[in-house]
Amino acid sequence: MEAENAGSYSLQQAQAFYTFPFQQLMAEAPNMAVVNEQQMPEEVPAPAPAQEPVQEAPKGRKRKPRTTEPKQPVEPKKPVESKKSGKSAKSKEKQEKITDTFKVKRKVDRFNGVSEAELLTKTLPDILTFNLDIVIIGINPGLMAAYKGHHYPGPGNHFWKCLFMSGLSEVQLNHMDDHTLPGKYGIGFTNMVERTTPGSKDLSSKEFREGGRILVQKLQKYQPRIAVFNGKCIYEIFSKEVFGVKVKNLEFGLQPHKIPDTETLCYVMPSSSARCAQFPRAQDKVHYYIKLKDLRDQLKGIERNMDVQEVQYTFDLQLAQEDAKKMAVKEEKYDPGYEAAYGGAYGENPCSSEPCGFSSNGLIESVELRGESAFSGIPNGQWMTQSFTDQIPSFSNHCGTQEQEEESHA
C-alpha cells in the first residue's frame, strides 16, 4: 500500500510540474505519430536519364574541333635574364666584328699607286709604218696596257707566246719589244677605239661606229698586206659598221672582204686573251698563227718548205683535256738494284769515247768464253730473263779491240 501511495504521489507531482495536461498529451501522442506517418509520401524512384547513342570515332587523322571564339593575341615572351645572356651578347659582338673585317676585300695595288680614274684618261699610241706585212687590231686599250704603255702586257695574254711558237718571231718576245716589231718582222699594232676602259662592254655603239671609220682611214693610209682582227667580236662589229654585213657563222681565218679601196686582206684569229673560253691555252691558238705566217709568205712570194706537210686541223676542248690526262706519265723512281740485276746493262759504259757501246760490261763475252749460260752470271742468285741488249750484236766488243785491229792493219 505504501508503494502504491508513493507511486501515485510521484505521478501527481509530475502532473503538477507540467503546465500542459499530462494525460491529454499522453493520449494524443500516438495519434500524432500515426498522422505524421500517413502524411509522408512514399519515395518514388527517380527516372533514369536517357542514354545518348555513342558515336564511333572516325578512322584516320584526328582533327581538333574548330572554335568559333576569336583567339586572344599571344603576348611575346620576355627574355629571361641570366648570367649567360651577357656572355652570348659579347660573343655576338666579337663575331660581327670579325665577319665585317673579313667581308672587306683586300685591294691589290696593280698600278703602283696610280688611280683607275687617272688611267682612264690615258691612251695607247699606235705602232704603224708603211710597207707592213701584218697589223694586229684590238678593240681598245685596257687598264694594264694604258699603265704600261705597251700592247698586250698582261702576264696571262697568249699573244707573245703564239708569236714565237708559230715562227712569226725568231725569239721569245714580250710587250717591251712591241716597238721593234715593225722593223724586224713587219708587224704593227692599233686599236679600233682609242679610249681606255676596264672592259669592252663599257664602250657604246656610237664609239664603235666612229672607231670603225677611223680604222678604215688608218688602213687606207698605211695599206698593210693583212689586217688581223684579234678576236671574232672585233670583226663582227667592223663588218657590220664598214661593210654593212652582219656575218653569220663566222669562222676563223681569211675573210672574203677586203678593206675598201685597198688590197689589204682581212684575217680573223682567236682572241689572245686567257679568258677566251673556246681556246683556253696558247697551244690551242697557235694553228691560226701558223696559217697567218703561211698567208704572209704566200703574199710575199716566199716558197713554202716542202718537207712540212699540211694536215687538217680540228680541235675539241673535251677531247684535248682527256688526251692531256692520258699523256701524263709519272716518272719512275730510281731503283739502285735495277742495274745490278741486269748485270750493269744500263750502267755507264767504260768505253766513254765510243758513240754507242751495247756490251754489258763484258758480261756476255766472259760467259761465252767460259761456255756458261747467261743466266748463271746473275748476281745475288736472282733468276731473271735475258736482257734485250744481249740479243743485239755488239759493235765494239771491248775498248781496245779497235786499236788492236788498227795495229794489225798497219
From Swiss-Prot:
Keyword Repressor assigned: no
Record's keyword terms, sorted: Activator, Chromatin regulator, DNA damage, DNA repair, Hydrolase, Isopeptide bond, Nucleus, Transcription, Transcription regulation, Ubl conjugation
Effect noted on mutating residue 197 to A: Reduced DNA glycosylase activity on G/T mispairs
Glycyl lysine isopeptide (Lys-Gly) (interchain with G-Cter in SUMO2) crosslink location in chain: 103, 248, 330
Pfam families associated with the record: UDG (PF03167)
Record note on what altering residue 281 to A does: Restores the DNA-binding ability of the sumoylated form
Catalytic function, reaction form: Hydrolyzes mismatched double-stranded DNA and polynucleotides, releasing free thymine
PTM per Swiss-Prot/TrEMBL: Sumoylation on Lys-330 by either SUMO1 or SUMO2 induces dissociation of the product DNA.
Substitution effect: residue 140 to A: Loss of DNA glycosylase activity but still able to bind DNA
Gene Ontology MF annotations: ATP binding; chloride ion binding; damaged DNA binding; DNA binding; DNA N-glycosylase activity; DNA-binding transcription factor binding; double-stranded DNA binding; G/T mismatch-specific thymine-DNA glycosylase activity
EC number: 3.2.2.29
Enzymatic class: hydrolase
PANTHER family with a match to the protein in the record: G/T AND G/U MISMATCH-SPECIFIC DNA GLYCOSYLASE, G_T MISMATCH-SPECIFIC THYMINE DNA GLYCOSYLASE
Protein name: G/T mismatch-specific thymine DNA glycosylase
Organism of derivation: Homo sapiens
Gene symbol of the encoding locus: TDG
